[in-house]
Amino acid sequence: TDQQAEARSYLSEEMIAEFKAAFDMFDADGGGDISVKELGTVMRMLGQTPTKEELDAIIEEVDEDGSGTIDFEEFLVMMVRQMKEDAKGKSEEELAECFRIFDRNMDGYIDAEELAEIFRASGEHVTDEEIESIMKDGDKNNDGRIDFDEFLKMMEGVQ
């Protein structure tokens, strides 16, 4: 399927080989599939930490025929999905750290003055008009300041 081709293109040959080795360890009968019960164990072995709820959701999505087993291609799709989720969570933590640094007075918001300070500190020359424009773009609820959710939305466009 398209999903399977996309999953393979996201991974290096080494990663695919590593995933295959882990998968094969649990494919006891060599039939080319593993049970959903074994799935969590394999994922943890490969450095993923899915919760019970995440595993249930993953299994529901991946085990389309309801057989209770997952083949290697379905497994690859699922691992890539999990890796992307983990990466997203990490970048959100990094953005939270940035937000705390920018929010000089620690009131939970970035105002125009704090935004201007950020640019000045980075050696970037920006006019008051540019600051105003950035504030207007980021301040979705028009309260004159940028909260964390607005900051995340702003940064999505940057990455």
From Swiss-Prot:
Instruction: Extract one GO cellular component term from the record.
Output: troponin complex
Residue ranges occupied by any EF-hand domain in the UniProt entry: 14-49, 50-85, 90-125, 126-159
Q: Which UniProt keywords apply?
A: Acetylation, Calcium, Metal-binding, Muscle protein, Repeat
Q: Where does Ca(2+) 2 bind?
A: 63, 65, 67, 69, 74
Q: Which residues bind Ca(2+) 1?
A: 27, 29, 33, 38
Q: Which PROSITE patterns match?
A: EF_HAND_1 (PS00018), EF_HAND_2 (PS50222)
Q: Positions modified as N-acetylthreonine?
A: 1
Q: Which GO terms describe its biological process?
A: skeletal muscle contraction
Task: List the InterPro entries.
Answer: CALM/Myosin/TropC-like (IPR050230), EF-hand-dom_pair (IPR011992), EF_Hand_1_Ca_BS (IPR018247), EF_hand_dom (IPR002048)
Q: Name one GO molecular function term.
A: calcium ion binding
Residues that, per the record, bind Ca(2+) 4? 139, 141, 143, 145, 150
**Which top-rank group of organisms is this from?**
Eukaryota
Binding residues for Ca(2+) 3, per the UniProt record? 103, 105, 107, 109, 114
Q: What exactly does this protein do?
A: Troponin is the central regulatory protein of striated muscle contraction. Tn consists of three components: Tn-I which is the inhibitor of actomyosin ATPase, Tn-T which contains the binding site for tropomyosin and Tn-C. The binding of calcium to Tn-C abolishes the inhibitory action of Tn on actin filaments.
For this chain, the family text in UniProt reads: Belongs to the troponin C family.
Q: Which PANTHER family match?
A: MYOSIN LIGHT CHAIN 1, 3, TROPONIN C2, FAST SKELETAL TYPE
Share any extra remarks. Skeletal muscle troponin C binds four calcium ions.
Under which name does UniProt file this protein?
Answer: Troponin C, skeletal muscle
Q: What is the lineage of its organism?
A: Eukaryota, Metazoa, Chordata, Craniata, Vertebrata
